[in-house]
Structure formats: structure tokens, C-alpha cells
């Protein structure tokens, strides 16, 4: 089974580096680690941080031309997810979870995670009217996450 761990958002420079937006709260991007992009395995050669992104190069791909085709591609691993701390989770596992407000009222179901420069938004299909809403995935709104549901704190105009 494959597990999504990030996305190549852009190339960087001329020496075969790519910018990666990780989907995980823990470090999967280390030298020597194998990742899968478009059904091909790549071994990580170097990793360095740049703001909320990682700059990564792969063994055997030394030029911009070598990595150009990786732009906007999801990155996977075939290794089991690591055990997480109690306040961490695997972002792809949020899809399909039920979302409740602070009064335990069912708002809807998570359809997808939208990656924006500020972080992630949850696209939720509303249970009451079939419309979708976007909720910022930040501590101000997300109060708890478990294996079956997400509880949020709503404010006027959020939903």
C-alpha cells in the first residue's frame, strides 16, 4: 500500500532540486530514504528547509531537466506510517471524516484537503444543503480529531 507524504510543488535552481510541501508532521524526507513519484522510486540525496517547504535532490538526477517532469506530482512511500504523537495525524486520513461543531451538530463530511500557501483547508460537503464549505485547518477552528470525526469551533460567517 502507498501512503501520500507530500507533493512536489516546483523545481528549484539548475542542480536538480525540487520544492516539496510535506503532508506529514514528522520527518520522512531524509538522506537515503526512498520515495515514489509517478510509479518510480527515487532515493533522496539532499534535504534542506526553506520556510514551510523542503528543497530535495535525488540520486542520479543532477539537473533541472532531470526533475522538470516531477512538478505538481504527489510523493508516496510504501513504508507503514509511523506511530504518531497524540496530537498528530496523517493528513490524507482526514478525507471522509464527519465534521461536527461545538454543539455536536453534524456539519458534513471532509471531501478533500486544499493546499494553500498558508496551510490546508478542509473542503466539507455540508450535510444539510449539499453545498461545500472551506474550513481553515488551524487550531483556532479545529478542536479535536480522532479516527472517525473532526470537531470544530464555528464563528459567524465560517459556514
UniProtKB/Swiss-Prot annotation:
Keyword tags: Chaperone, Cytoplasm, Ribosome biogenesis, rRNA processing
CC terms in the record's Gene Ontology section: cytoplasm; ribosome
Domain PRC barrel, chain residue ranges per copy: 86-159
Pfam hit, one: PRC_RimM
Family annotation (InterPro entries): PRC_barrel-like_sf (IPR011033), PRC_RimM (IPR056792), RimM (IPR011961), RimM_N (IPR002676), RimM_N_sf (IPR036976), Transl_B-barrel_sf (IPR009000)
Gene3D superfamilies tied to this protein: PRC-barrel domain, RimM
Subcellular location: Cytoplasm
Main location: cytoplasm
Protein's UniProt keywords contain Oxidoreductase: no
Molecular functions per Gene Ontology: ribosome binding
One GO term (biological process): rRNA processing
Subunit note: Binds ribosomal protein uS19.
Function: An accessory protein needed during the final step in the assembly of 30S ribosomal subunit, possibly for assembly of the head region. Essential for efficient processing of 16S rRNA. May be needed both before and after RbfA during the maturation of 16S rRNA. It has affinity for free ribosomal 30S subunits but not for 70S ribosomes.
Domain notes from UniProt: The PRC barrel domain binds ribosomal protein uS19.
The family this protein is said to belong to: Belongs to the RimM family.
Protein name: Ribosome maturation factor RimM
Gene name linked to the record: rimM
